[in-house]
Amino acid sequence: MQAVLLSADLMVVSRVQGAGAKSSTAIRALSNPALVVETCGEVEAELLLVDLAMPSIDLESIVGQLKAGTSRAVRIVAFGPHVHEDRLAAARAAGCDAVMSRGQFFASVEALLVG
């Protein structure tokens, strides 16, 4: 599986890449939201993981472009601190396939990476 991770948090990147290594999933980590759609297409990503702790993400635009512009379905999972209720709600409204707290995400990241 190919996955793209959008996060500027090096600890998040490290943990997700470690989980990817265990599941033989290639993880392309990005810290620039402007590169997400292009990178998902380049690596033929099946999964996009979005860290909602990042500032200035136009998630509605990213989700819309990925859902409309690719022949391959990209599952979009957004995660963030449980105290950021507005960001979690906005991710749901934007059309993410799954939205979860950071704790839920890290508890299930290996399962997410195997499909």
Role assignments for model-derived ranges:
Residues 65-78:
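Short beta-strand/loop segments at the ligand-binding rim of alpha/beta enzyme cores
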Residues 95-107:
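Output/docking surface of receiver
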